[in-house]
Regions:
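A short beta-strand element within beta-rich, extracytoplasmic domains
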Residues: 79-91, 144
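C-terminal outer-membrane/trafficking sorting elements
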Residues: 577-625
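Sec-dependent N-terminal signal peptides
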Residues: 4-13
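Trp- and acidic/polar-enriched beta-sheet ligand-binding modules for extracellular glycan
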Residues: 64-68, 91-164
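Conserved oxyanion/phosphate-binding beta-strand-loop segments in alpha/beta enzyme cores
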Residues: 202-256
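Disordered, acidic Ser/Thr/Pro-rich linker "stalks" and the adjacent N-terminal cap
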Residues: 20-75, 88-95, 121, 163-167
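Middle-to-C-terminal accessory/interaction subdomains
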Residues: 177, 188-190, 211-215, 221-223, ...
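Internal "kinase-insert"/substrate-recognition segments embedded within catalytic cores
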Residues: 235, 240-241, 256-257, 277-282, ...
């Protein structure tokens, strides 16, 4: 509400300023130019000055195809209020401006550049196009960054504004989502998971939140690094707490969601994890990502899975912790099919590959490595031993049952064929228990894997239905889940508790709808950049042709999957219609998915965001007091 009011005032002020603002002049600057007649770098034709000569028949074109730009040094900071552009006069020109980004900066290397505008339509040759800019920061340098593979090829640019240092009271976003802006030294594109590229990273929220710091950037992930839309890991120079994230930390991840055309499967799984009451659920927020001025798409800014009081909250080991109770923890590891590609890893006695995440590979001591390998093998021996079902000496002795089984249920509800391909676990200091979690990696979950599609047509659990597993994990889970007669009772109890805590199709479908609305502008930009809605990517079983169809199927899947799980676990769900006898009824969930009210009349609600169901109709409500 406050931000909407501010925008109305800002727009009114901006419209008054336009009458006074004129076209700005400055020193043209840009990437090296190309001479198309020779294919070589040019210092005589297609120069940056050609984009500011008032002649729509001339043009600027860069030698390199991507991450190239042309702009002005204005001499002093100016608040930019309007921008104009015209595409190169040739057969390809109109399309070359689409997804170009207008940026402003106060460093001549543009390391502190922020996006002012993104062009979303083709241009018209021989015609100037204009857009109003709403940004309170004054910038000395302005530039047009051409879209990928376009060589800029711009006929004319014009910037309007007035001299002022401005302030940061309003910084624009491209779609209504927060933005992560990465500028790397010399515009080097991150190219592998090993080499950290010197960077400057800014995170701009929709309510004025702002983070800026030196950082390094590299690729992250495994199979996802092969996609054209790359995933990234950011490491800030100092600990940062961006947006509404709980953790203050240096390391953050940008998940690319290339094969997930809803762009929200991971976020949905995180929400389900919260409904199950997992000790820690990773933070996730949909964001737009800009790399060196180029729009990269809709991503999710997420926690790095690491030891932190607001992430995996265990003691952080020192290299002096080599004996006694200090040697017992904390440890964080990943059962990992790719473990043999890592430095700090082991293969268990029953062929389960494990990557040790904490202590770090360059800090862990021989004593610590031996301790956690021995402890894992002891737990595994209980699972595969003759007394595995014994309440005292069986698998429960060293493996925490509740977190392992909740992790299992989240994997099954989501239909995640990769549940046991990668499993995070941790051990606390002074405790003889291994805890499972957090949940992670759901790009191919929710019926997005051709190997198991359609999941709901199968009679058995998805982990037994052609999914992938690291080493011998499938047999490990079989022994815990199927061979111990007491386990199923425990699974039913945990499922029932989650169902009573708000895990139902009404809430989850309403949550999906609210996310789709929040991400609508961003998803349009994303699929403008990555034209894949009509093609099968990664493990897609079906190409549904539109974002709306992808979201609709996600809701259809979750509705049927909850019904499937109820039947499989023989759980009878009591709906609100069964407990409210009046002709009208309300059910209210809070932002975490917890039912806070159900009854015949709507109560007065405290400030916050709620999902309200009234006689079967669901809406999202914001109470702002």
């Amino acid at each position: 509400m406050k931000k909407t009011f501010f925008l109305i005032i800002l727009m009114a002020i901006t419209s008054m300023v336009f009458a006074e603002d004129s076209v700005l002049t400055g020193q043209p600057m840009g990437s090296p130019s190309v001479d198309y007649s020779t294919g070589a770098v040019s210092i005589t034709v297609n120069q940056p000055s050609s984009a500011f000569d008032g002649d729509l028949s001339t043009f600027y074109a860069s030698y390199d195809r991507s991450y190239t730009w042309v702009g002005l040094d204005l001499g002093k900071p100016h608040v930019i209020t309007r921008v104009g552009w015209s595409p190169r006069n040739d057969g390809v020109g109109p399309d070359r401006v689409k997804l170009a980004v207008i940026e402003g900066a106060n460093r001549n290397d543009f390391m502190d550049a922020i996006p002012l505008y993104i062009i979303t339509d083709n241009g018209v040759i021989g015609q100037m196009h204009y857009a109003d800019i709403l940004c309170s920061r004054g910038v000395r340098y302005v530039r047009y960054v051409g879209p990928n593979n376009a060589r800029c090829n711009i006929a004319e640019l014009a910037f309007f504004g007035h001299e002022s240092a401005g302030d940061d009271s309003y910084l624009p976003t491209l779609s209504g989502l927060p933005m992560v802006i990465i500028q790397t030294k010399d515009a080097v594109e991150p190219y592998d998971k090993v080499n950290d590229i010197e960077s400057y990273v800014q995170i701009i929220g929709i309510d004025g939140e702002y983070v800026i710091d030196s950082a390094t950037t590299r690729l992250r992930g495994n199979a996802s690094t092969q996609f054209p839309k790359k995933p990234y890991r950011i490491k800030f120079e100092s600990k940062q707490k961006p947006l509404d994230a709980p953790a203050k930390a240096k390391k953050w991840t940008l998940i690319n969601n290339y094969g997930d055309k809803t762009l929200m499967r991971n976020l949905l799984a995180f929400r389900i994890s919260q409904l199950f009451g997992m000790p820690y659920t990773p933070y996730g927020q949909a964001v737009d990502v800009i790399l060196n001025g180029e729009y990269k798409g809709c991503y999710q800014l997420c926690d790095q899975i690491e030891v932190n009081k607001n992430r995996v909250n265990i003691d952080e080991m020192e290299n002096t912790d080599t004996s006694g109770e200090n040697l017992t923890g904390g440890y964080l590891w990943e059962i990992d099919a790719y473990a043999n590609e890592e430095v700090s890893w082991f293969n268990s006695k029953n062929n389960i590959p494990v990557t040790i995440k904490s202590p770090d590979e360059d800090e862990i001591t021989r004593e610590q490595s031996k301790y956690i390998e021995d402890f894992f093998n002891a737990m595994e021996a209980d699972v595969f031993g003759s007394q595995y079902a014994d309440a005292v000496n069986g698998w429960r002795r060293l493996l925490d049952a509740e977190t392992f089984l909740k992790h299992f249920l989240i994997g099954e509800l989501s239909g995640n064929t990769d549940t046991y391909w990668s499993v995070y676990q941790y051990k606390k200091r002074g405790e003889n228990k291994i805890y499972t979690g957090p949940v992670w990696d759901f790009d191919i979950a929710f019926d997005n894997d051709y190997r198991t599609y359609p999941v709901n047509n199968k009679s058995d659990f998805v982990y037994r239905s052609g999914g992938s597993s690291a080493g011998n994990m499938k047999s490990f889970v079989d022994r815990v889940l199927l061979l111990d007669p007491n386990t199923l009772t425990e699974v039913k109890r945990l499922w029932g508790e989650a169902r009573e805590n708000g895990l139902n199709e009404e809430y989850l479908c309403a949550w999906i709808d609210s996310m789709a609305i929040e991400m609508d502008r961003s998803q349009q930009l994303n699929f403008m950049r990555w034209n894949i809605l009509n093609s099968k990517e990664h493990m897609n079983p079906v190409a549904r042709g539109s974002y709306a169809s992808e979201v609709a199927y996600l809701k259809e899947y979750i509705t049927k999957r909850i019904e499937w799980m109820d039947k499989k676990l023989r759980y009878v769900y009591t709906s609100v219609e069964d407990v409210v006898s009046s002709d009208t009824y309300y059910r209210v969930w809070d932002i975490l998915g917890r039912i806070i009210y159900q009854g015949a009349s709507l109560p007065v609600l405290d400030q916050g965001i709620y999902v309200i169901m009234h006689n079967g109709t669901i809406k999202t409500s914001v109470v702002d007091k």
